[in-house]
Amino acid sequence: MSTVTPPRTPRRLGAGLAATAALGALLAAAPQAGAASPAPAARPGDLLTVRLDQLLPTQPSVGKDQIFYKLGRYGSRKDEQAGDFNKRFDDWCETNGQGEAEKVPSGARLADPTSFTCEIPLGNETDESRAAMKIVVIGPGGSLYLTDGHHSLTSFWEAADGGPETPIRLRVQADYSGLSQSAFWDEMRAHHWVWLRDEQGAPITTGELPTRLGLSRFHDDPYRSLVYFTRDIGYTAPEDAAEYLEFLWGGWLRERLDLGAYDLDDPASYLRAVRDASELMVAADPDEVIADGRTAAELGRLDEWNDGKKAEKGEFGKLSQPLTAEKPGKLAFALDYRSRIVAPPRCTTTLRGPRTGPLVVDSGVTCLDNTRQTGPVVVRAGASLVALGSELTGPVQAVGARDVHVCGTTIDGPLSVVGSGLRTEGPGCSANSFGGPVQLVANTRG
Protein backbone atom coordinates (compact mmCIF):
# COMPACT_ATOMS: atom_id res chain seq x y z
CA MET A 1 0.00 0.00 0.00
CA SER A 2 1.37 3.42 -0.98
CA THR A 3 1.10 6.24 1.51
CA VAL A 4 0.97 9.99 1.10
CA THR A 5 2.78 11.62 4.00
CA PRO A 6 0.88 14.73 5.08
CA PRO A 7 2.90 17.95 5.27
CA ARG A 8 3.44 19.91 8.44
CA THR A 9 0.28 21.78 9.35
CA PRO A 10 0.28 25.59 9.69
CA ARG A 11 -0.18 26.87 13.23
CA ARG A 12 -3.61 26.72 14.79
CA LEU A 13 -5.19 29.71 16.48
CA GLY A 14 -4.49 28.76 20.06
CA ALA A 15 -3.90 30.12 23.52
CA GLY A 16 -2.62 33.45 22.24
CA LEU A 17 -6.12 34.20 20.98
CA ALA A 18 -8.01 32.89 23.98
CA ALA A 19 -9.31 36.32 24.89
CA THR A 20 -10.41 36.94 21.33
CA ALA A 21 -12.14 33.58 21.13
CA ALA A 22 -14.03 34.44 24.28
CA LEU A 23 -15.63 37.27 22.34
CA GLY A 24 -17.50 34.68 20.32
CA ALA A 25 -15.19 33.64 17.48
CA LEU A 26 -13.93 30.12 17.21
CA LEU A 27 -11.39 30.23 14.40
CA ALA A 28 -10.34 26.68 13.59
CA ALA A 29 -7.30 26.80 11.32
CA ALA A 30 -6.86 24.42 8.43
CA PRO A 31 -3.91 24.03 6.04
CA GLN A 32 -3.67 26.30 3.04
CA ALA A 33 -5.44 24.98 -0.04
CA GLY A 34 -2.99 23.29 -2.33
CA ALA A 35 -0.35 23.00 0.42
CA ALA A 36 -0.43 19.20 0.49
CA SER A 37 2.51 17.16 -0.73
CA PRO A 38 1.98 15.50 -4.11
CA ALA A 39 1.17 11.82 -4.22
CA PRO A 40 3.83 9.32 -5.25
CA ALA A 41 3.47 7.36 -8.47
CA ALA A 42 0.73 4.78 -8.10
CA ARG A 43 -1.01 2.11 -10.12
CA PRO A 44 -4.77 1.61 -10.47
CA GLY A 45 -6.00 -0.31 -7.46
CA ASP A 46 -3.30 0.95 -5.10
CA LEU A 47 -4.49 2.29 -1.76
CA LEU A 48 -3.31 5.76 -0.77
CA THR A 49 -3.50 7.17 2.74
CA VAL A 50 -4.31 10.88 2.50
CA ARG A 51 -5.69 13.72 4.55
CA LEU A 52 -9.01 15.25 3.58
CA ASP A 53 -7.39 18.64 2.99
CA GLN A 54 -5.23 17.12 0.23
CA LEU A 55 -8.19 16.31 -2.01
CA LEU A 56 -9.52 18.31 -4.95
CA PRO A 57 -13.25 17.96 -5.77
CA THR A 58 -14.47 17.03 -9.24
CA GLN A 59 -18.01 18.37 -8.83
CA PRO A 60 -19.29 21.85 -7.90
CA SER A 61 -22.27 20.86 -5.80
CA VAL A 62 -23.54 18.26 -3.35
CA GLY A 63 -26.91 17.31 -1.95
CA LYS A 64 -26.46 19.05 1.37
CA ASP A 65 -29.43 17.35 3.00
CA GLN A 66 -27.59 14.04 2.60
CA ILE A 67 -24.65 15.49 4.54
CA PHE A 68 -27.00 17.06 7.09
CA TYR A 69 -28.45 13.60 7.71
CA LYS A 70 -24.97 12.22 8.37
CA LEU A 71 -24.00 15.13 10.64
CA GLY A 72 -27.30 14.96 12.51
CA ARG A 73 -26.81 11.26 13.16
CA TYR A 74 -23.12 11.66 14.00
CA GLY A 75 -24.05 14.17 16.69
CA SER A 76 -26.91 12.07 18.09
CA ARG A 77 -26.82 9.45 20.85
CA LYS A 78 -29.51 7.32 19.19
CA ASP A 79 -27.07 4.68 17.94
CA GLU A 80 -25.46 4.30 21.35
CA GLN A 81 -28.86 4.15 23.05
CA ALA A 82 -29.72 1.24 20.74
CA GLY A 83 -26.54 -0.56 21.80
CA ASP A 84 -24.56 0.25 18.65
CA PHE A 85 -21.49 2.32 17.89
CA ASN A 86 -22.14 5.77 16.46
CA LYS A 87 -22.54 5.49 12.71
CA ARG A 88 -19.61 7.78 11.99
CA PHE A 89 -17.17 5.05 13.06
CA ASP A 90 -18.87 2.43 10.87
CA ASP A 91 -18.83 4.90 7.97
CA TRP A 92 -15.13 5.67 8.44
CA CYS A 93 -14.16 2.00 8.67
CA GLU A 94 -16.19 1.12 5.58
CA THR A 95 -14.70 4.02 3.61
CA ASN A 96 -11.21 2.97 4.73
CA GLY A 97 -11.78 -0.55 3.37
CA GLN A 98 -12.08 -2.14 6.81
CA GLY A 99 -15.73 -3.14 7.12
CA GLU A 100 -17.50 -1.88 10.25
CA ALA A 101 -16.24 -0.61 13.60
CA GLU A 102 -15.24 -3.33 16.06
CA LYS A 103 -14.15 -1.41 19.18
CA VAL A 104 -14.92 2.23 19.96
CA PRO A 105 -13.64 3.23 23.41
CA SER A 106 -14.89 6.33 25.17
CA GLY A 107 -13.07 9.36 23.79
CA ALA A 108 -12.51 7.86 20.32
CA ARG A 109 -12.25 10.45 17.54
CA LEU A 110 -12.54 10.24 13.75
CA ALA A 111 -9.47 12.42 13.36
CA ASP A 112 -7.43 9.80 15.25
CA PRO A 113 -8.06 6.34 13.77
CA THR A 114 -5.73 4.81 16.37
CA SER A 115 -8.41 5.61 18.97
CA PHE A 116 -10.83 2.98 17.60
CA THR A 117 -10.65 -0.39 15.83
CA CYS A 118 -12.25 -1.64 12.61
CA GLU A 119 -13.26 -5.27 12.09
CA ILE A 120 -10.89 -5.85 9.12
CA PRO A 121 -7.21 -5.25 9.99
CA LEU A 122 -5.10 -3.21 7.60
CA GLY A 123 -3.67 -5.49 4.95
CA ASN A 124 -6.54 -7.99 5.21
CA GLU A 125 -8.96 -6.14 2.94
CA THR A 126 -11.34 -8.21 0.84
CA ASP A 127 -12.60 -7.51 -2.67
CA GLU A 128 -15.91 -6.51 -1.08
CA SER A 129 -14.34 -4.13 1.43
CA ARG A 130 -12.12 -2.54 -1.24
CA ALA A 131 -15.15 -2.02 -3.46
CA ALA A 132 -16.71 0.17 -0.75
CA MET A 133 -13.74 2.55 -0.73
CA LYS A 134 -13.83 5.96 -2.40
CA ILE A 135 -11.90 6.73 -5.57
CA VAL A 136 -9.07 9.13 -6.42
CA VAL A 137 -7.32 10.04 -9.67
CA ILE A 138 -3.75 11.35 -9.50
CA GLY A 139 -3.43 14.45 -11.64
CA PRO A 140 -0.58 16.63 -12.91
CA GLY A 141 2.09 17.23 -10.31
CA GLY A 142 0.66 14.51 -8.09
CA SER A 143 -2.52 16.43 -7.21
CA LEU A 144 -5.28 14.22 -5.83
CA TYR A 145 -8.70 14.48 -7.50
CA LEU A 146 -11.58 12.84 -5.65
CA THR A 147 -14.02 11.26 -8.12
CA ASP A 148 -16.30 9.45 -5.66
CA GLY A 149 -17.11 10.15 -2.02
CA HIS A 150 -17.65 13.91 -1.87
CA HIS A 151 -20.62 13.48 0.48
CA SER A 152 -18.99 10.92 2.78
CA LEU A 153 -15.67 12.74 3.08
CA THR A 154 -17.32 16.14 3.54
CA SER A 155 -19.30 14.57 6.40
CA PHE A 156 -16.02 13.47 8.01
CA TRP A 157 -14.60 16.97 7.42
CA GLU A 158 -17.55 18.64 9.14
CA ALA A 159 -17.95 16.13 11.99
CA ALA A 160 -17.20 17.54 15.44
CA ASP A 161 -14.38 15.03 15.97
CA GLY A 162 -13.21 15.01 12.34
CA GLY A 163 -11.87 17.94 10.37
CA PRO A 164 -9.61 18.75 7.43
CA GLU A 165 -6.70 16.69 8.76
CA THR A 166 -8.71 13.47 9.17
CA PRO A 167 -6.85 10.64 7.40
CA ILE A 168 -8.52 8.19 5.04
CA ARG A 169 -7.44 5.65 2.45
CA LEU A 170 -8.60 5.93 -1.15
CA ARG A 171 -8.41 3.53 -4.07
CA VAL A 172 -6.48 4.83 -7.09
CA GLN A 173 -8.51 4.89 -10.30
CA ALA A 174 -5.75 6.18 -12.58
CA ASP A 175 -2.40 7.98 -12.46
CA TYR A 176 -2.30 10.91 -14.88
CA SER A 177 0.46 12.75 -13.04
CA GLY A 178 2.56 12.94 -16.20
CA LEU A 179 -0.09 14.68 -18.30
CA SER A 180 -0.51 18.38 -18.96
CA GLN A 181 -3.52 20.05 -17.36
CA SER A 182 -5.30 20.16 -20.71
CA ALA A 183 -4.66 16.48 -21.48
CA PHE A 184 -5.62 15.54 -17.92
CA TRP A 185 -9.03 17.18 -18.16
CA ASP A 186 -9.57 15.61 -21.59
CA GLU A 187 -9.07 12.19 -19.98
CA MET A 188 -11.33 13.06 -17.03
CA ARG A 189 -14.13 14.13 -19.38
CA ALA A 190 -13.69 11.09 -21.59
CA HIS A 191 -14.06 8.74 -18.61
CA HIS A 192 -16.93 10.77 -17.05
CA TRP A 193 -14.81 11.28 -13.92
CA VAL A 194 -15.73 14.96 -13.57
CA TRP A 195 -19.18 16.54 -13.21
CA LEU A 196 -19.24 19.92 -14.94
CA ARG A 197 -22.77 21.10 -14.23
CA ASP A 198 -23.92 23.44 -11.49
CA GLU A 199 -26.83 22.97 -9.11
CA GLN A 200 -29.23 24.22 -11.80
CA GLY A 201 -27.89 21.78 -14.40
CA ALA A 202 -26.03 24.51 -16.31
CA PRO A 203 -22.53 23.72 -17.67
CA ILE A 204 -19.43 25.03 -15.89
CA THR A 205 -15.69 24.98 -16.60
CA THR A 206 -13.03 23.06 -14.70
CA GLY A 207 -11.80 26.40 -13.33
CA GLU A 208 -15.10 26.78 -11.48
CA LEU A 209 -14.68 23.59 -9.43
CA PRO A 210 -14.08 24.02 -5.68
CA THR A 211 -10.46 23.78 -4.56
CA ARG A 212 -11.10 21.69 -1.46
CA LEU A 213 -13.78 19.82 0.47
CA GLY A 214 -16.09 21.32 3.09
CA LEU A 215 -19.77 22.26 3.11
CA SER A 216 -19.06 25.92 2.51
CA ARG A 217 -17.11 25.10 -0.66
CA PHE A 218 -20.02 23.39 -2.41
CA HIS A 219 -23.30 24.68 -3.76
CA ASP A 220 -26.45 22.81 -2.79
CA ASP A 221 -28.32 20.73 -5.37
CA PRO A 222 -31.69 19.81 -3.79
CA TYR A 223 -32.40 17.29 -6.55
CA ARG A 224 -29.21 15.44 -5.65
CA SER A 225 -30.51 15.21 -2.06
CA LEU A 226 -33.90 14.07 -3.32
CA VAL A 227 -32.34 11.20 -5.28
CA TYR A 228 -30.37 10.13 -2.21
CA PHE A 229 -33.60 9.77 -0.23
CA THR A 230 -35.25 7.78 -3.03
CA ARG A 231 -32.55 5.09 -2.87
CA ASP A 232 -34.11 1.62 -2.63
CA ILE A 233 -37.54 3.23 -3.03
CA GLY A 234 -37.39 4.34 -6.67
CA TYR A 235 -34.00 2.98 -7.70
CA THR A 236 -31.10 0.96 -6.36
CA ALA A 237 -27.48 1.54 -7.31
CA PRO A 238 -26.31 -1.24 -9.66
CA GLU A 239 -22.93 -2.89 -9.16
CA ASP A 240 -21.60 -1.22 -12.32
CA ALA A 241 -23.16 2.12 -11.40
CA ALA A 242 -22.57 5.03 -13.77
CA GLU A 243 -20.31 7.80 -12.55
CA TYR A 244 -22.33 10.54 -10.84
CA LEU A 245 -25.44 8.36 -11.07
CA GLU A 246 -27.42 10.45 -8.58
CA PHE A 247 -26.79 13.63 -10.59
CA LEU A 248 -28.07 11.89 -13.72
CA TRP A 249 -31.33 10.97 -12.01
CA GLY A 250 -31.45 14.43 -10.43
CA GLY A 251 -31.26 16.17 -13.79
CA TRP A 252 -34.07 13.99 -15.10
CA LEU A 253 -36.25 14.75 -12.08
CA ARG A 254 -35.53 18.48 -12.34
CA GLU A 255 -37.41 18.50 -15.66
CA ARG A 256 -40.40 16.61 -14.24
CA LEU A 257 -40.85 17.60 -10.61
CA ASP A 258 -41.00 21.15 -9.26
CA LEU A 259 -39.54 21.12 -5.76
CA GLY A 260 -40.88 24.63 -5.31
CA ALA A 261 -44.30 23.03 -4.88
CA TYR A 262 -43.16 21.38 -1.63
CA ASP A 263 -42.11 22.73 1.75
CA LEU A 264 -38.75 21.05 2.24
CA ASP A 265 -38.61 22.27 5.84
CA ASP A 266 -41.69 20.20 6.64
CA PRO A 267 -41.13 16.43 7.07
CA ALA A 268 -44.53 15.44 5.66
CA SER A 269 -44.13 17.64 2.58
CA TYR A 270 -40.56 16.45 1.99
CA LEU A 271 -41.77 12.84 2.23
CA ARG A 272 -44.40 13.62 -0.41
CA ALA A 273 -41.64 14.92 -2.67
CA VAL A 274 -39.65 11.71 -2.13
CA ARG A 275 -42.71 9.59 -2.87
CA ASP A 276 -43.63 11.56 -5.98
CA ALA A 277 -40.05 11.44 -7.27
CA SER A 278 -39.60 7.74 -6.63
CA GLU A 279 -42.95 6.93 -8.26
CA LEU A 280 -41.82 8.84 -11.36
CA MET A 281 -38.62 6.79 -11.43
CA VAL A 282 -40.48 3.49 -11.19
CA ALA A 283 -43.01 4.62 -13.82
CA ALA A 284 -40.25 5.36 -16.34
CA ASP A 285 -39.91 2.86 -19.16
CA PRO A 286 -36.87 0.65 -18.45
CA ASP A 287 -35.48 1.58 -21.90
CA GLU A 288 -36.01 5.32 -21.49
CA VAL A 289 -32.73 7.22 -21.75
CA ILE A 290 -32.34 9.24 -18.56
CA ALA A 291 -29.02 10.99 -19.28
CA ASP A 292 -25.64 10.45 -20.96
CA GLY A 293 -27.06 7.58 -22.99
CA ARG A 294 -27.97 5.60 -19.86
CA THR A 295 -31.40 4.03 -19.59
CA ALA A 296 -33.59 3.88 -16.51
CA ALA A 297 -32.78 0.18 -16.15
CA GLU A 298 -29.04 0.88 -16.36
CA LEU A 299 -29.40 3.51 -13.64
CA GLY A 300 -31.04 1.04 -11.26
CA ARG A 301 -34.76 1.77 -11.71
CA LEU A 302 -36.82 -0.51 -9.47
CA ASP A 303 -39.61 -2.56 -11.02
CA GLU A 304 -41.92 -1.81 -8.07
CA TRP A 305 -42.19 1.24 -5.86
CA ASN A 306 -40.53 0.73 -2.46
CA ASP A 307 -39.35 -2.65 -3.81
CA GLY A 308 -42.92 -3.94 -3.64
CA LYS A 309 -43.48 -3.15 0.05
CA LYS A 310 -46.26 -1.08 1.61
CA ALA A 311 -45.59 2.56 2.42
CA GLU A 312 -45.19 1.87 6.14
CA LYS A 313 -42.64 -0.86 5.41
CA GLY A 314 -39.33 -1.08 3.58
CA GLU A 315 -37.07 1.89 2.95
CA PHE A 316 -39.93 4.38 2.70
CA GLY A 317 -41.20 3.22 6.09
CA LYS A 318 -37.73 3.70 7.58
CA LEU A 319 -37.37 7.12 5.96
CA SER A 320 -40.71 8.20 7.45
CA GLN A 321 -39.69 7.70 11.09
CA PRO A 322 -39.68 10.91 13.21
CA LEU A 323 -36.79 12.13 15.33
CA THR A 324 -38.54 10.83 18.45
CA ALA A 325 -38.50 7.24 17.15
CA GLU A 326 -36.02 4.69 18.46
CA LYS A 327 -34.52 4.66 14.97
CA PRO A 328 -35.25 8.03 13.33
CA GLY A 329 -35.35 8.25 9.56
CA LYS A 330 -32.72 9.98 7.47
CA LEU A 331 -35.06 12.89 6.73
CA ALA A 332 -35.68 13.52 10.43
CA PHE A 333 -31.95 13.74 11.15
CA ALA A 334 -31.38 15.96 8.10
CA LEU A 335 -34.14 18.46 8.87
CA ASP A 336 -33.22 18.64 12.55
CA TYR A 337 -29.61 19.46 11.70
CA ARG A 338 -30.59 21.93 8.98
CA SER A 339 -32.85 23.76 11.45
CA ARG A 340 -29.76 24.66 13.49
CA ILE A 341 -27.93 26.34 10.63
CA VAL A 342 -27.80 30.14 10.61
CA ALA A 343 -28.28 31.26 7.02
CA PRO A 344 -26.08 34.12 5.78
CA PRO A 345 -27.76 37.36 4.72
CA ARG A 346 -29.14 37.43 1.18
CA CYS A 347 -26.57 38.60 -1.38
CA THR A 348 -27.05 41.87 -3.26
CA THR A 349 -23.73 41.43 -5.10
CA THR A 350 -21.97 38.12 -5.78
CA LEU A 351 -18.35 37.77 -6.87
CA ARG A 352 -16.85 34.51 -8.15
CA GLY A 353 -13.51 33.35 -9.52
CA PRO A 354 -10.22 35.30 -9.48
CA ARG A 355 -10.22 39.00 -8.64
CA THR A 356 -7.32 41.40 -8.12
CA GLY A 357 -7.43 44.84 -6.51
CA PRO A 358 -9.02 46.49 -3.47
CA LEU A 359 -12.57 45.47 -2.57
CA VAL A 360 -14.61 48.03 -0.62
CA VAL A 361 -18.05 46.97 0.60
CA ASP A 362 -19.88 50.17 1.52
CA SER A 363 -23.51 49.03 1.32
CA GLY A 364 -25.66 45.95 0.87
CA VAL A 365 -24.39 42.38 1.10
CA THR A 366 -21.38 41.39 -0.98
CA CYS A 367 -20.90 37.63 -1.27
CA LEU A 368 -17.62 36.00 -2.20
CA ASP A 369 -18.52 32.59 -3.59
CA ASN A 370 -15.42 30.46 -4.18
CA THR A 371 -13.64 33.72 -4.97
CA ARG A 372 -9.86 34.12 -5.17
CA GLN A 373 -9.46 37.72 -4.03
CA THR A 374 -6.01 39.34 -4.10
CA GLY A 375 -5.96 42.74 -2.47
CA PRO A 376 -7.34 44.43 0.66
CA VAL A 377 -10.99 43.97 1.66
CA VAL A 378 -12.76 46.70 3.64
CA VAL A 379 -16.32 46.41 4.96
CA ARG A 380 -17.87 49.76 5.91
CA ALA A 381 -20.32 50.40 8.73
CA GLY A 382 -23.77 48.98 8.01
CA ALA A 383 -22.59 46.83 5.09
CA SER A 384 -22.19 43.05 5.07
CA LEU A 385 -19.64 40.56 3.74
CA VAL A 386 -20.28 36.85 3.18
CA ALA A 387 -17.23 34.77 2.25
CA LEU A 388 -17.92 31.12 1.46
CA GLY A 389 -15.19 28.76 0.28
CA SER A 390 -12.99 31.63 -0.82
CA GLU A 391 -9.28 32.43 -0.73
CA LEU A 392 -8.40 35.97 0.30
CA THR A 393 -4.84 37.28 0.03
CA GLY A 394 -4.41 40.59 1.79
CA PRO A 395 -5.83 42.36 4.83
CA VAL A 396 -9.53 42.09 5.72
CA GLN A 397 -11.04 44.83 7.88
CA ALA A 398 -14.60 45.46 9.10
CA VAL A 399 -15.72 48.14 11.56
CA GLY A 400 -19.38 48.46 12.49
CA ALA A 401 -20.40 46.02 9.77
CA ARG A 402 -23.90 44.63 9.90
CA ASP A 403 -22.70 41.07 9.20
CA VAL A 404 -19.38 39.39 8.52
CA HIS A 405 -20.12 35.76 7.67
CA VAL A 406 -16.95 33.77 6.91
CA CYS A 407 -17.06 29.99 6.38
CA GLY A 408 -14.66 27.58 4.71
CA THR A 409 -12.42 30.48 3.74
CA THR A 410 -8.65 31.01 3.75
CA ILE A 411 -7.40 34.48 4.69
CA ASP A 412 -3.68 35.01 4.08
CA GLY A 413 -3.25 38.35 5.77
CA PRO A 414 -4.40 40.22 8.88
CA LEU A 415 -8.06 39.98 9.88
CA SER A 416 -9.67 42.73 11.96
CA VAL A 417 -13.38 42.76 12.80
CA VAL A 418 -14.59 45.33 15.33
CA GLY A 419 -18.10 46.10 16.56
CA SER A 420 -19.75 43.94 13.93
CA GLY A 421 -22.05 40.96 13.62
CA LEU A 422 -19.63 38.07 13.18
CA ARG A 423 -20.06 34.40 12.30
CA THR A 424 -17.07 32.11 11.70
CA GLU A 425 -18.28 28.76 13.08
CA GLY A 426 -21.30 26.66 13.90
CA PRO A 427 -23.45 24.07 12.12
CA GLY A 428 -23.05 24.29 8.36
CA CYS A 429 -20.08 26.68 8.60
CA SER A 430 -16.85 24.98 7.52
CA ALA A 431 -13.65 25.70 9.44
CA ASN A 432 -11.58 28.66 8.25
CA SER A 433 -7.82 29.07 7.84
CA PHE A 434 -6.13 32.28 8.97
CA GLY A 435 -2.51 32.96 8.05
CA GLY A 436 -2.01 36.32 9.72
CA PRO A 437 -2.78 38.20 12.94
CA VAL A 438 -6.41 38.19 14.03
CA GLN A 439 -8.17 40.99 15.93
CA LEU A 440 -11.80 40.46 16.94
CA VAL A 441 -13.18 43.06 19.32
CA ALA A 442 -16.67 43.75 20.71
CA ASN A 443 -18.50 41.74 18.07
CA THR A 444 -21.88 40.09 18.34
CA ARG A 445 -22.66 36.64 17.01
CA GLY A 446 -24.01 37.03 13.50
Predicted regions and their residues:
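Secretory targeting and sorting signals
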Residues: 1-36
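Surface-exposed, charge/polar-rich loops and edge strands
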Residues: 42-117, 122-127, 132-136, 140-143, ...
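Hydrophobic residues embedded in beta-strands of well-ordered beta-sheets
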Residues: 143-145, 366, 385
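Tight coil/turn sites that cap or link beta-strands
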Residues: 346, 352-356, 363-365, 374, ...
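Sequence contexts marking disulfide-bonded cysteines in secreted/extracellular proteins
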Residues: 92-94, 117-119, 346-348, 366-368, ...
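Feature marks extracellular polysaccharide-active and adherence modules
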Residues: 362, 369, 374, 380, ...
